[in-house]
């Protein structure tokens, strides 16, 4: 399944993997998964975290390594995000609930994820998604961005 990913996607997932893998040992534990989920405003229980790991933990060692992570991401991409998941993600970014994601809100979430972006990078991300050119991302634009492969 992971063999259907492009080089670029694999590189992106490698970057995402290292955001999760806080201690850099090449595996993601339930603790590390929990940290990232919480930084995204989610509050999973220990059991839910364990389930998430078990779902992709091919060798059964209780952690996720990069190949397992790739499989998980490929699977997620195949059953493309449901409307509800996208709406949920939008809510995480839209801190003040005004229906738009501003550069400041985007920067805030990315920083929480441990992703230090320059103002230029944040502006570039907004520009890429901002179809109507108002300098922020509305829900429709967000959906387009999330569903365009």
Swiss-Prot record:
Keywords tagged on the record: Acetylation, Calcium, Metal-binding, Methylation, Repeat
Q: Which residues carry this modification: N6,N6,N6-trimethyllysine?
A: 116
Does the record carry Magnesium as a key word?
no
Residues involved in Ca(2+) 4 binding:
130, 132, 134, 136, 141
Q: Tell me the disulfide pairings in this chain.
A: none
Q: List-wise, which residues carry N-acetylalanine?
A: 2
Q: Which domain of life is it from?
A: Eukaryota
One GO cellular component term noted in the UniProt record for this chain: myosin II complex
The Swiss-Prot or TrEMBL record annotates one GO molecular function as: calcium ion binding
* UniProt keyword annotation of DNA repair present: no
Q: So what does this one do? A: Calmodulin mediates the control of a large number of enzymes, ion channels and other proteins by Ca(2+). Among the enzymes to be stimulated by the calmodulin-Ca(2+) complex are a number of protein kinases and phosphatases.
- Protein name per Swiss-Prot or TrEMBL: Calmodulin
Q: Which organism does this record belong to? A: Metridium senile (Brown sea anemone)
């Amino acid at each position: 399944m992971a063999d259907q990913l492009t080089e670029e996607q694999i590189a992106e997932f490698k970057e995402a993997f290292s955001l999760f893998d806080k201690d850099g040992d090449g595996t993601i534990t339930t603790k590390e998964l929990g940290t990232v989920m919480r930084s995204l405003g989610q509050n999973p229980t220990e059991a839910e975290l364990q389930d998430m790991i078990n779902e992709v933990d091919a060798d059964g060692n209780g952690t996720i390594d990069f190949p397992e992570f790739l499989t998980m991401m490929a699977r997620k991409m195949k059953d493309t995000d449901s409307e509800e998941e996208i709406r949920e993600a939008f809510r995480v970014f839209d801190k003040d609930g005004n229906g738009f994601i501003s550069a400041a809100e985007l920067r805030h979430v990315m920083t929480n994820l441990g992703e230090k972006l320059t103002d230029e990078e944040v502006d570039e991300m907004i520009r890429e998604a901002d179809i109507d050119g108002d300098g922020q991302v509305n829900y429709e634009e967000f959906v387009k961005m999330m569903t365009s492969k």
